């Protein structure tokens, strides 16, 4: 049999097939099935910042409507509301590392540089072999320049790589004013891989 072993982000893979972040990698059962199918590594389904923000905002709106909101509530939502999905994600990483023998790569979908560096550290502590930062800056703000959108990537990379020692990859959007130059500058940061491109659902006409 041919030797298909490769190195990706410094990780030894038995073959170059990596199961991308998706519904297939969102559960331990799915991850084990992918290993049984022969993949070389898995990227766990992304932890989405937008979903956590929306859940938190919905809860705050409900509390505000019924008059149950106080200044200290902001502290509560800063941690407790975010903790539940993050804790579940950390558990999935730990369980996967215990059950499978292929590299397990965590994935964070970021739109800000606020909390994610701290979460990245916890992901490393849970045993993830590497981390994929799925960064997206929607180019729809008339007051935000292309340079400001790109700066978000570098801010997140700088903060995360200063806190973790596991390999870090960045998955980028195809919305770039100068893709070649942007890729070159990303390659000069401490990240170990650039993934092209993240995929977002678009409206369609039936």
Please name every model-derived segment.
Residues 71-80:
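Short glycine/proline- and acidic residue-enriched helix-loop micro-motifs
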Residues 1-18, 89-97:
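N-terminal amphipathic alpha-helix/helix-capping segment at the start of soluble metabolic enzymes
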């Amino acid at each position: 049999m041919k030797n298909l072993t490769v190195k990706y982000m410094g990780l030894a893979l038995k073959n170059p097939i990596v199961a991308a972040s998706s519904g297939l990698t969102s559960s331990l059962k799915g991850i084990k099935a992918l290993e049984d199918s022969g993949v070389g590594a898995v990227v766990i389904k992304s932890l989405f910042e937008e979903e956590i923000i929306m859940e938190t905002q919905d809860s705050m709106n409900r509390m505000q409507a019924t008059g149950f909101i106080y200044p200290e509530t902001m502290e509560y939502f800063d941690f407790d509301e975010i903790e539940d999905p993050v804790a579940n994600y950390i558990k999935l990483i730990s369980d996967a590392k215990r059950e499978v023998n292929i590299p397990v790569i965590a994935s964070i979908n970021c739109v800000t540089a606020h909390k994610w560096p701290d979460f990245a550290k916890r992901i490393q502590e849970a045993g993830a072999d590497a981390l994929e930062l799925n960064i997206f800056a929607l180019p729809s703000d008339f007051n935000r320049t292309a340079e400001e959108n790109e700066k978000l990537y570098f801010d997140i990379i700088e903060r995360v790589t200063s806190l973790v020692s596991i390999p870090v990859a960045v998955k980028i959007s195809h919305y770039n004013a100068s893709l070649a130059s942007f890729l070159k500058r990303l390659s000069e940061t401490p990240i170990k891989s650039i993934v092209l491109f993240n995929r977002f659902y678009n409206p369609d006409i039936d």
